Amino acid sequence: MPQHPKHMKSLGHLMALQRPTVWVDHFPVLEQLGEPPNPDKTLMVDIGGGFGQQSKALRSRCPNVEGKIIVQDMPQTLASAEPAEGVEFSEHDFFQPQPVKGAKFYYLRHVLHDWPDEQCVQILQQVIPAMAPESRILIDEVVIPVTGVPWQAAFMDLLMMESFASIERTRAEWEALMDKAGLKIIEEYYYDGKEQAILVVIPK
């Protein structure tokens, strides 16, 4: 894929269309924010954020909230990203230590479902040392029910298992994964009809 930038761009648009619902419309950003950061601080780091659609949505819907919004991804992905006012793009491998310290939100959308637990723990543990006491990790993923799973979530679960040896996770599985990483879920916000949720996570 890195050798075919046009295909990379198409893949990014396809991934955005698969989950068209915008997280920030269902998450109380201002309530969670508390005291707003000043312009020199970081509001959100969008880890593995692709073309930055979710970061652009946050900036668009909260134009008066100060603080940097930074999208991190691999260089071959960012090469196809379109610039946006108020959103920065930075090359970063999420298996390496998080370089941005003290952000309010460290946001991961559809990152962890690509990986089995061992790699997910590695990804999350790169973030923890960068967190300030007021920082929160936001995990935007499918949380599948134990029974009555929507067909979209069931299909994605099988696809993740076949393609990446990974899975879509239940609430209990997410909780167990966070525990392995030294984290805990303190709040959760469900939205859309596919069991999508934002899990608010802090160190134990």
Curated annotation (Swiss-Prot):
Binding sites annotated in the UniProt record for S-adenosyl-L-methionine: 48-49, 73, 93-94, 109
Residues annotated as catalytic: 113 (proton acceptor)
Record's keyword terms, sorted: Methyltransferase, S-adenosyl-L-methionine, Transferase
Induction summary: The genes forming the sterigmatocystin biosynthesis cluster are co-regulated and induced on oatmeal porridge or the fungal isolates were grown either on oatmeal porridge or in YEC medium (0.2% yeast extract, 5.0% corn steep liquor).
GO terms, biological process: methylation; sterigmatocystin biosynthetic process
Molecular functions (GO terms): O-methyltransferase activity
EC number: 2.1.1.109
Null allele phenotype: Impairs the production of sterigmatocystin and leads to the accumulation of demethylsterigmatocystin.
Pathway: Mycotoxin biosynthesis; sterigmatocystin biosynthesis
Catalytic activity: 6-demethylsterigmatocystin + S-adenosyl-L-methionine = sterigmatocystin + S-adenosyl-L-homocysteine + H(+)
Role description: Norsolorinic acid reductase; part of the gene cluster that mediates the biosynthesis of sterigmatocystin (ST), a polyketide-derived furanocoumarin which is part of the most toxic and carcinogenic compounds among the known mycotoxins. The first step in the biosynthesis of sterigmatocystin is the production of hexanoate by the fatty acid synthase (FAS) units stcJ and stcK. The polyketide backbone is assembled by the non-reducing polyketide synthase stcA by condensation of the starter hexanoyl-CoA and 7 malonyl-CoA extender units followed by cyclization and release of norsolorinic acid.
PANTHER family registered for this protein in UniProt: HYPOTHETICAL O-METHYLTRANSFERASE (EUROFUNG)-RELATED, PUTATIVE (AFU_ORTHOLOGUE AFUA_4G14580)-RELATED
Family: Belongs to the class I-like SAM-binding methyltransferase superfamily. Cation-independent O-methyltransferase family.
Protein known as: Demethylsterigmatocystin 6-O-methyltransferase stcP
Species assigned in the record: Emericella nidulans (strain FGSC A4 / ATCC 38163 / CBS 112.46 / NRRL 194 / M139) (Aspergillus nidulans)
